[in-house]
């Protein structure tokens, strides 16, 4: 047969091989070649008619190279079990006009009716939080941790599900410390987060169709975390990662299409309120003088709020002048616009500034709608409603002050409502206009003052939560929630007020002669005498204490936050960002072998594999080596006395259901400086100072003789004993914690202090006194 006819087909190209620089896996770095000296001379000789090169072969003297690193190995427990914690959570839920709120702080709220949640979040994840989600039926564990007191953390896979209409931006942080500062919330604003190279966009299905409906992100262990076996109690409160997320708008990044301008408008109190802003009872006389000055200024009554606040009081026959009852018609100005006679009024809060109005009732030509008799009605209405509130609430209402009343007080809608009969005759406020794209942040200041503060100036001690040199649209993002966490007051929206200083508004919110002067803004609904959201149902207690607080200033912060670039404009009633997580753990330990024997002839049900497997999950807080039986505790078929004594100290669980935490566990902690911590502790209990050892070159009697003698005279013996007992108790607690930390270090179970929660590191043990 002609086998030569079928010749082998030649390759027209070389055989494919992988290029070394295109390998899938990274190769190990090659050790550099040893440098050799100059080549020796070669002696050649002719043999057999041909020349042959000849070398002198020397024996190379080698040297053993030392290892640069050694591998430290750790013996693993006898029993190991992999566990995946899989669950679903809403990263954030944003209701209508709640863009500037922090969802992590409001995730457990029960307020209804009204919008829920917030447009940004600062979530953290710990093993305790994962167990809490398991108790809420929000996740499942693939393996039980019962009797396995050791654990290893391997990382997590996150799956973010894309929304049909709304875009999101997320940022995952694994670098400790996992604490909030005054710059955390502003950095999560979409305008700031869009410039972060570590941020990840979660586009909506409308913005990017045709792609997967989820985005997967693999996250490793935290930085500076050593991968080894730890007791579950040590990793229970260690922060594994934090997720920063915010709603954004990629289709309309520079303003909503439903508005015709990007300029924000709001109102601030005029300078007449500067020294009368406090609500303390000892400032009541100054408030009464200011209220009299405001109520005597007749042009302030040129608004429809005068009818809403005073007409029901007059129609009920409560306005009595002498023996006659005043009617509403007798309060109106009946002078026709046929004369040019004028009337001069002294502007409230001043003694020399006068304003001229015509005597006629045409408000379009600087006339007054009401006559001089209206100025007494507001005060009478405020006094009557204040006494009625006292009678209704009884002893539970102790602060009766008509100057802070709803109908005719200092902050009544009669003086502060922006809707005037003529726009050129405003009330006791100033209209402010703000363009977010002209704000450079230089000179901006945002802080809060307690309601008892007597002025509007910034004070380093009394003022709190200062954010400076940032654009107002970024500083307003998540500001109220940061103030609540920083001060520790969960009711701060009723106990503090917001102040703003900015040179980028029109007119400028600053005083050049007083750089610390601030201005108090308020929302449109507060000026109209309504609750946030536009509801007219004002509670009776709030009607007796009607003054600007953070509750009535939140809408101003909301408008400022929504004016920034890429901000979500709350065009939908409610949006949410869903997330699936898969935390990877390994449980380990040396448990006692338990043999469970069941009756093979009796089965309660026969359902095959359709019934989900039930797992016994133990709280990691109590799953410690001290509260677990091990193989070495079991000898000769019995448990040892030490093991039984150790297990008897196990705390028992109570069946009392608590009302829940005031703040969700998923919300991140806030960073406190040492000075702020000392101030807080001094408010809670008297300071306890450690005795300082006096060097031999100092004379302690000369330095402390005066102070000690005065203190000993004022304090009794019992007070000194109580203070010493308190000092000894605190020192005992600190020493026990210190010995516990030293023992963990000796057992190679120590964790980096930056990964521990606040107060769990060694540095916090010595913060007793300066």
UniProtKB/Swiss-Prot annotation:
Q: Where mainly located?
A: virion
Q: Which UniProt keywords apply?
A: Capsid protein, DNA replication, T=1 icosahedral capsid protein, Virion
Quote the subcellular location field of this record. Answer: Virion
GO BP terms: DNA replication
User: Where does the UniProt annotation place the signal sequence?
Assistant: none
Q: Show the segment(s) annotated as Disordered.
A: 645-682, 697-717
Function, as annotated, reads: May self assemble to form an icosahedral capsid. Presumably essential to initiate and monitor viral genome replication by a rolling circle mechanism.
| UniProt name for this protein | Probable capsid and replication-associated protein
Record the organism.
Torque teno virus (isolate Human/Ghana/GH1/1996)
User: Top-down, what is the taxonomic lineage of the species of origin?
Assistant: Viruses, Viruses incertae sedis, Anelloviridae, Torque teno virus
């Amino acid at each position: 047969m002609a086998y030569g006819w079928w010749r082998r087909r030649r390759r027209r190209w070389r055989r494919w091989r992988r290029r070394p620089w295109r390998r899938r896996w990274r190769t190990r770095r090659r050790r550099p070649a040893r440098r050799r000296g100059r080549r020796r001379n070669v002696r050649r000789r002719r043999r057999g008619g041909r020349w042959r090169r000849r070398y002198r072969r020397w024996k190379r003297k080698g040297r053993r190279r030392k290892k640069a690193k050694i591998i430290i190995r750790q013996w693993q427990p006898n029993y190991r079990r992999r566990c995946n914690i899989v669950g679903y959570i809403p990263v954030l839920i944003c209701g209508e006009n709640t863009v500037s709120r922090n969802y992590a702080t409001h995730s457990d709220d029960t307020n209804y009716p009204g919008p829920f949640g917030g447009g940004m979040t600062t979530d953290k994840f710990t093993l305790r939080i994962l167990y809490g989600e398991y108790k809420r039926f929000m996740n499942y564990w693939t393996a039980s941790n019962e009797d396995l007191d050791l654990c290893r953390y391997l990382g997590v896979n996150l799956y973010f599900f894309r929304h049909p209409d709304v875009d999101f931006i997320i940022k995952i942080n694994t670098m400790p410390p996992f604490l909030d500062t005054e710059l955390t919330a502003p950095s999560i604003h979409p305008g700031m987060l869009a410039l972060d190279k570590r941020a990840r966009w979660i586009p909506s299905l409308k913005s990017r169709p045709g792609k997967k409906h989820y985005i997967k992100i693999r996250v490793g262990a935290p930085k500076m975390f050593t991968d080894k076996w730890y007791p579950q109690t040590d990793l229970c409160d260690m922060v594994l990662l934090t997720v920063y997320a915010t709603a954004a708008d990629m289709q309309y990044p520079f303003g909503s299409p439903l508005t015709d301008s990007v300029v924000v408008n709001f109102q601030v109190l005029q300078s007449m309120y500067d020294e009368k802003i406090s609500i303390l009872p000892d400032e009541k006389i100054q408030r009464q003088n200011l209220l009299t000055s405001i109520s005597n200024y007749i042009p302030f009554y040129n608004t429809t709020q005068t009818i809403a606040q005073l007409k029901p009081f007059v129609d009920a026959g409560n306005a009595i002048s002498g023996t006659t009852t005043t009617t509403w018609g007798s309060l109106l100005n009946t002078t026709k616009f046929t004369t040019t006679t004028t009337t001069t009024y002294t502007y409230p809060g001043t003694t020399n500034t006068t304003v001229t109005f015509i005597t006629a009732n045409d408000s379009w030509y600087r006339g007054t709608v009401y006559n001089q008799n209206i100025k007494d009605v507001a005060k009478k209405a405020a006094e009557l409603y204040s006494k009625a509130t006292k009678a209704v609430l009884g002893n539970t209402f102790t602060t009766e002050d008509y100057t802070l009343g709803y109908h005719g007080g200092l902050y009544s809608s009669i003086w502060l409502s922006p809707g005037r009969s003529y726009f050129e005759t405003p009330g006791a406020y100033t209209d402010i206009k703000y363009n977010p794209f002209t704000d450079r942040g230089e000179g901006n200041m945002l802080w809060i003052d307690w309601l008892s503060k007597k002025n509007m100036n910034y004070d380093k001690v009394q003022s709190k939560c200062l954010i400076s040199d940032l654009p107002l649209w970024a500083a307003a993002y998540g500001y109220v929630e940061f103030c609540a966490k920083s001060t520790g007051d969960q009711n701060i929206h009723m106990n503090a007020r917001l102040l703003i200083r900015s040179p980028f508004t029109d007119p400028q919110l600053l005083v050049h002669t007083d750089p610390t002067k601030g201005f108090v803004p308020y929302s449109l609904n507060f000026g109209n005498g309504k609750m946030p959201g536009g509801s007219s149902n004002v509670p009776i207690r709030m009607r007796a204490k009607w003054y600007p607080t953070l509750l009535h200033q939140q809408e101003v912060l909301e408008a400022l936050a929504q004016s920034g670039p890429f901000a979500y404009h709350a065009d939908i009633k409610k949006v949410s960002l869903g997330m699936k997580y898969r935390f990877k753990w390994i449980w380990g330990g040396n448990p006692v072998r338990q043999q469970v024997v069941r009756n093979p002839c009796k089965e309660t049900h026969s359902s095959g594999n359709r019934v989900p497997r039930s797992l016994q999950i133990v709280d990691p807080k109590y799953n410690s080596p001290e509260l677990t039986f091990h193989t070495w505790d079991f000898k000769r078929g019995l448990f040892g006395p030490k093991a039984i004594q150790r297990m008897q100290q196990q705390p028992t669980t109570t069946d009392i259901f608590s009302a829940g935490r005031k703040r969700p566990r998923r919300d991140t902690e806030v960073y406190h400086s040492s000075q702020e911590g000392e101030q807080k502790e001094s408010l809670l209990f008297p300071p306890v100072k450690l005795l300082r050892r006096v060097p031999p070159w100092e004379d302690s009697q000369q330095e402390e003789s005066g102070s000690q003698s005065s203190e000993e005279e004022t304090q009794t013996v019992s007070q000194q004993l109580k203070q010493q007992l308190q000092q000894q108790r605190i020192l005992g607690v600190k020493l026990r914690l210190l010995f516990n930390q030293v023992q963990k270090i000796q057992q190679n179970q120590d964790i980096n202090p930056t990964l521990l929660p606040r107060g769990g590191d060694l540095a916090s043990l010595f913060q007793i006194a300066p």
